[in-house]
Structure formats: structure tokens, C-alpha cells
Amino acid sequence: MPRPAYRSRSLRRVKVRTPGGRTVVHYEKRAKGVPKCPVTNLPLGGMNHKVYRFGISIRAPSRPYGGVFSHKVLARALRLAVRG
């Protein structure tokens, strides 16, 4: 039985063949997904999702709520705010 830390499915399991011919299980972190809008569930435009070592202020567009909401949701919210 694996260690208690490896029993959960938060780490993905990869079968690796060793030089001695045995097959062992390695545990790796799962790949991160593309950033998505919480309202429309569309991928966020303008986000550099491949560069995770930089902060969100460098990766995200500089518009209001950039990197949080999609452009469609932002346009709708701005229209509602202006109209009253």
C-alpha cells in the first residue's frame, strides 16, 4: 500500500520503467489548466498561461478585471454601470 500522502488522487500516477527492468509508479503534480472566466467559462484572452513563474500583474491584461473576467462579461458590466 502506498504512503498516506500518495493515496489521494491530487497527484497523477505515471508508470516508469527503471533501468533494471522493473515498472514503478512515480507521482507528479497535475498540469494546470487554462485560466477561464467564472461567468462564461471561456478561456481568458490575453493571458500568458504558459509562464507561471511571473505574477498575475505581469501575465494579465491591464484593463479593469483583466485576468479575471472575459471581455464579454466586462463589456456587459460596463454597459449596465453606465446606464444606471
Curated annotation (Swiss-Prot):
- Lineage, top-rank taxon, reads Archaea
* InterPro entries found in the cross-reference section: Ribosomal_eL34, Ribosomal_eL34_CS, Ribosomal_L34e_arc-type
State the HAMAP family in the record. Answer: Ribosomal_eL34 (MF_00349)
Q: Which GO terms describe its molecular function?
A: structural constituent of ribosome
- From which organism does this entry originate? Pyrobaculum islandicum (strain DSM 4184 / JCM 9189 / GEO3)
Q: What name goes with this protein?
A: Large ribosomal subunit protein eL34
User: Got a GO cellular component term for this one?
Assistant: ribonucleoprotein complex
Listed under GO biological process in this entry are: translation
